[in-house]
Amino acid sequence: MMFRQSMLTLSLFAAFYANAESSDTVFQPASYTPSQMDFGGVGLIKMPTGRMAPEGEFNLSANINHEYRMYNASIALFPWFEATIRYAIVPNKRMGAQEFSGDSPYLDKGIDFKFRLLEESRWLPEVAVGVRDFGGTGLFDGEFIAASKKLYTNDYGVFDFTLGMGWGYMGMHGNVTNPFCKANDKFCERPKDFGGTGGEVDYHRWFKGPAAIYGGVEYQTPYQPLRLKVEYDTNDYSEDFPTRFRPGDFYEVDMTQHTPINVGLIYRAHRNIDLRLSYERGDTVSAGFSLRTNYNELASQWRDEPTPRPSNEQPENINEVDWQSLEKQLALVAGYEGVKIHVDDTTVIISGEQVKYRDSEIAHERAAAVLRNQLPKSINTYKVINTQQHIATEAADIDAKEYERVANVSYIKPHISDASSVSKDTKVRGQQVHDGSERLYYGVSPTLRQSIAEPEEFYIFNLGVRGEASYWLTNQLQASSSIQVNIYDNYPELNFIVPPDGTTVPPRVRSLGRMYFHDNPVRMDTLQLTWFDNFGDSIYQQTYAGYLESMFAGVGTEWLYRPRGKNWAIGADINLVAQRDPDSWFGVYQQETQYSAADGRSFKVLDKGYTGFVSGYYMPKWSWLDDTLFKIDVGQYLAQDVGVRGDFSKQFKSGVIVGAYASLSNLSSEEFGEGSFTKGFYISIPFDVMTVKPSRNRAKFDWQPLTRDGGQKLNKEHDLFSLTDSASPWFTRKNTVPQP
């Protein structure tokens, strides 16, 4: 019997570590790195610059003044591309009707993009173009083109000058004729309308209407922690949302711009922490901070078992091998668990699940070191097979004689690749001499279910404990189950059970979360049978039936074609599902129309329906899109709407993955509700950059701006693309950041 304590507590802030700067370095010759602005992203105070943050830099920032509280997350995905997600709270405005959102202040969500057009050279500035409040509600929407140029001095620090042109929110001064207006009259006026119910891309407004020239300078003083900023702000604030008084507002706000000159300072309190203070519009003080790290700089620092040194005490023949000891050493030293061992003439084959090392070469070298010491010299080949859910996904053949030369450093710079080769043959042959696999697995882990920026509460969460167990009935058939126990949540802050969001067309496949996650403090999340299979070395399949997730039961199958070593794969799944009754562990809804007595209204659920997709995966090898993954799903969602989901992710040197997805379907914006379509973002962080032990596990933070019912997928327990990752690694790519 095997017990593992699962480690699933999510932590983004574990990455924010560094040594504090010592006092003897702060007066070294000044060096300049771009800093964040109030809106998030690289900029001056309110106005963006042509600068980009270093590739891989992630910033969490906040800025507070009388009119706004802004919370931002920015990421430099590429040297030429930066994205920012922003929450803006407007304290003087009520979110909505009091019976719906109580006294919660107005909350706006926005996304910004910036693209570098020209990299700075000796004579030319760095030039960037960007869009603010992309797909938002239009509170801050605007566009800009900016150029920045640095001036270094020997004794007085670094000056970074910026000159730009803004439209929309950044062009309210209208101090220059819109150059696009001269080319086409449609650019002379900026449309007042915004698409749908928010969330749509209002590209028909871009670069239209009044334009304004802005500028400023950021000054890195000789005292390294201190930098100063001054800018000419071209928003006159006459149309800012807090100034638009309406019945129900908490109080009135005057945002008259007494001067367009804003000044500010930044103090670097720590290598990864900036404190900001600014004086804006001639009468407003703003304060903020930013926390940052760089995902291209997070090295793995382990305390690991030492690799065994070559020993002369090898057994004389195969009959003298202690297979039990060999299994334990393969798990402890090389990370292969549940090992089965076969002997085929002069080849020893081990197959097991790799749980420690993302770098397969480290796993192979450590396995070879163990096998070399515990097998007789008559063995010529070590075959190492990595399995996931008993599916073979990767194999390597290690020449025992060549490895002997590597282990004894018989030549300059020996490497495990000198003795090993990737094998397409993952079949097990010969006589089985040991079976270390465990049929029963069980574990307990903490869980955190959270939602940020809902209309009735900024942060809604559910903290609990999840117990899970699985049992292999055969080598291919697994029974599994999980039970969730709530410890604490703040769902009672919700003022409804069925959200009064105005939607009636799609069934409530995801927006009934409170009924499942709060009203049932102890619940069965999953109970299912799963059959795993593979055909040849490229085709994988799973079939499953039961209670598939917390909200749906059903039966389904998934197929995946994934050639080993290739940068693409094709898959498909089809599922017949029914929505589970939240008031019963084993029941499902029998009728489409239901009634909520607490809310006094009817609503629709999915009593029976199909969902499934054809999926394509592609990892391009283009230099300007290196280390990225595109995934496209085409099919039918849970709400029976039909459409396509696109998912794009970028992996940094440390293995941290940042991605975004969007689901488009045949639901109109009005049928979908606020947000217009489902969209989300996620960060996946390898445990081995946050802990001192090697691990292939990951912590994932997934965020959807709004949870609506359209464009939602089934949350299957197993995903074949993840299970077969070793066939062409994505999630288990090695950390390439040099050790400190």
Task: Specify the residue positions occupied by each region the protein language model found.
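Flexible, glycine-rich linker and terminal segments associated
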Residues: 22-23, 184, 193, 197-201, ...
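Short, aliphatic-rich beta-strand segments
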Residues: 58-60, 346-354
